[in-house]
């Protein structure tokens, strides 16, 4: 059984963390935010996943 275990290198872990979930995770979150389910992360997700930010009249908001 111990032969089934694979030890990940630091670079493999970093790569998985940096790419984890994209794009499916981002599209799922976008759909949930668009449906009105906001757990306080929608602004962050729009910025992180899509890099979309809208500035108007001194305030900023994210949009698709």
Swiss-Prot record:
Disulfide bonds join 26-49, 33-42. Residues 1-21 form the signal peptide. Its main location: secreted. Keywords: Antibiotic, Antimicrobial, Bacteriocin, Disulfide bond, Glycoprotein, Secreted, Signal. It comes from the Bacteria. GO terms for cellular component: extracellular region. Glycans are attached at residues 39, 64. GO terms for biological process: defense response to Gram-positive bacterium; killing of cells of another organism. It is found in: Secreted. The keyword RNA-binding does not apply. The keyword Ion transport does not apply. NCBIfam families: glycocin_F_RiPP (NF033417). Has antibacterial activity against L.plantarum ATCC 8014. In purified form, the activity is bacteriostatic (IC(50)=2 nM) rather than bactericidal. This is Bacteriocin glycocin F. It comes from Lactiplantibacillus plantarum. The lineage of its organism: Bacteria, Bacillati, Bacillota, Bacilli, Lactobacillales. The gene is gccF.
């Amino acid at each position: 059984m111990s032969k089934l275990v694979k030890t990940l290198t630091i670079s493999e872990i970093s790569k998985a963390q940096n790419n984890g979930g994209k794009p499916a995770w981002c599209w799922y979150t976008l759909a949930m935010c668009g449906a009105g389910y906001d757990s306080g992360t929608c602004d962050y997700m729009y910025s992180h996943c899509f890099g979309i930010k809208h500035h108007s009249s001194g305030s900023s908001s994210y949009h698709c």
